[in-house]
Amino acid sequence: MSRKKTPKSKGGSVPAASTLPAAANGPRLAHPRTARPGPEAPPNGPPQSGRPSLGGTGDFYDVAFKVMLVGDSGVGKTCLLVRFKDGAFLAGTFISTVGIDFRNKVLDVDGMKVKLQIWDTAGQERFRSVTHAYYRDAHALLLLYDITNKDSFDNIQAWLTEIQEYAQQDVVLMLLGNKVDSTQERVVKREDGEKLAKEYGLPFMETSAKSGLNVDLAFTAIAKELKQRSTKAPSEPRFRLHDYVKREGRGVSCCRL
């Protein structure tokens, strides 16, 4: 298999195939509409197949996918991304993301180099129109809430409705309860997150950008799911995202720092 080198220019994407489920016992979402047309991706946007590398980062890859982090402002999207990409924690004063930003990381998934181009979106309402344009070609979405902020959890349903309207029907979606290291400030029970995820048929885990708990697991699970969707041979056993998340995340202490 020939390998590409991470381009800095925009391009197309590798298709995925799954459906965002409606709630089983909760309010049923409308059937997803075709994603609305938006502006062209910026020069450093998602890599397109068949495009030559125009600049070197030294990261060769076999297949690339676009992943978006979404959720209310302040839930820790940027910190989660920095923890995954750089293995560091952004301590100190909180600064909201303005507009949208992205970083690349190449993972070795079952012998294949998988590049995730991860887009960090602003959660504030005034940036929503910008964010909507980026849903259309996203292969996966990580939807975050803050376990110390009840409003961010209550707003998950509104985010799901927005995703249903603007994202592709086959997008991979995972729910994350972030800041699990803040045990003393917790106001959203783990059971509440599990219940909501079950209603919508979503894989779920709690994460901590501060300690790194389940951060790599979340992105690795997404990469495995997307990789198999794009390359699965008829004889290859199906990768089960829900089972993988439950198995790999089980027994991990949320207080381990």
UniProtKB/Swiss-Prot annotation:
Indicate the enzyme's highest-level EC class. Answer: hydrolase
* Residues anchoring lipid (S-geranylgeranyl cysteine): C254, C255
Please give the biological process terms from Gene Ontology that the record holds.
exocrine system development; Golgi to plasma membrane protein transport; regulated exocytosis; regulation of exocytosis; regulation protein catabolic process at presynapse; vesicle-mediated transport
Alphabetical list of SUPFAM superfamilies matching this protein: P-loop containing nucleoside triphosphate hydrolases (SSF52540)
| Tissue specificity statement from the Swiss-Prot or TrEMBL entry | Expressed in pancreas, kidney, brain, submandibular gland, and lung.
**Mainly localized where?**
membrane
Please indicate which superkingdom the organism of origin belongs to.
Answer: Eukaryota
Q: Where in the cell is it found?
A: Cytoplasmic vesicle, Secretory vesicle membrane; Golgi apparatus membrane
Residue positions annotated to bind GTP are 73-79, 96-97, 123, 178-179, 181, 209-210
Q: Name one Pfam family in it.
A: Ras
Q: Which cofactor does it need?
A: Mg(2+)
Quote the InterPro entries the UniProt record gives. P-loop_NTPase, Small_GTP-bd, Small_GTPase, Small_GTPase_Rab
Per the record, membrane topology reads: Lipid-anchor
Give the UniProt keywords, A-Z: Cytoplasmic vesicle, Golgi apparatus, GTP-binding, Hydrolase, Lipoprotein, Magnesium, Membrane, Metal-binding, Nucleotide-binding, Prenylation, Protein transport, Transport
Residues annotated for Mg(2+) binding in this entry: T78, T97, D120
GTP-binding as a keyword? yes
Q: What is known of its domains?
A: Switch 1, switch 2 and the interswitch regions are characteristic of Rab GTPases and mediate the interactions with Rab downstream effectors. The switch regions undergo conformational changes upon nucleotide binding which drive interaction with specific sets of effector proteins, with most effectors only binding to GTP-bound Rab.
Please describe the quaternary structure of this protein: Interacts with ADRA2B. Interacts with RIMS1.
Write down what this protein is called. Answer: Ras-related protein Rab-26
Gene name of the encoded protein = Rab26
